[in-house]
Amino acid sequence: MTTPTAADVDRYLVDSLIGADAAPALVANAEAGLPPIDVSPPQGKLLNLLARSIGARRVLEIGTLGGYSTEWLARAVGDGGTVVTLEFEPRHAAVARENLDRAGVGDRVDIRVGAALDTLPEVAEDLGDPFDLVFIDADKVNNTNYVQWALRLTHPGSVIIVDNVVRGGAVADEQSADPNAQAGRDLVELLAAEPTLDATVIQTVGSKGWDGFAYAVVV
């Protein structure tokens, strides 16, 4: 018997626990030529479950791509809930809008186009109630900046999740020349030093390889 790979396990788990509910977005993203850097289906479902577990009604996402993770989060906030998502590339944002409207959750999602460090001040200015959950999956070198913004836009008990922190183990390599790995180390150091955050990092393995995400609670 051939030993199953991590990708095989992902396929089994998708078939058993997730199904094709949000799969059309992945297909549309591929057809539009978007880079295949969406979260995996098990990771998308995890985001959905985490948001539901804290009763999140207001979510901020930094890094939309084609809206796959956005759809999972929009399903979680329910009717009357809001996801504000920030995307640098106008074409990606347009694909995301089509995907979200097709999925029937477009009315829950506010897509802001532009560099996140430019649009975050606008989000802060427009802010009514603070966000219950922030999901960060954008340019890694700005993760510490994004977390600092997230702290301004959340409340005690809010959750901040940052994707792609482990980088195939490179986050533990002090000598790594990979700027994304160094960004991961900078993030871990910030999470350790910031008194208003209680955080951990969970390693993941699957069809997306070896990586991991930071999970922090605002205290």
Label every PLM stretch briefly.
Residues 1-135, 140-161, 165-219:
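A short alpha-helical cap/connector motif
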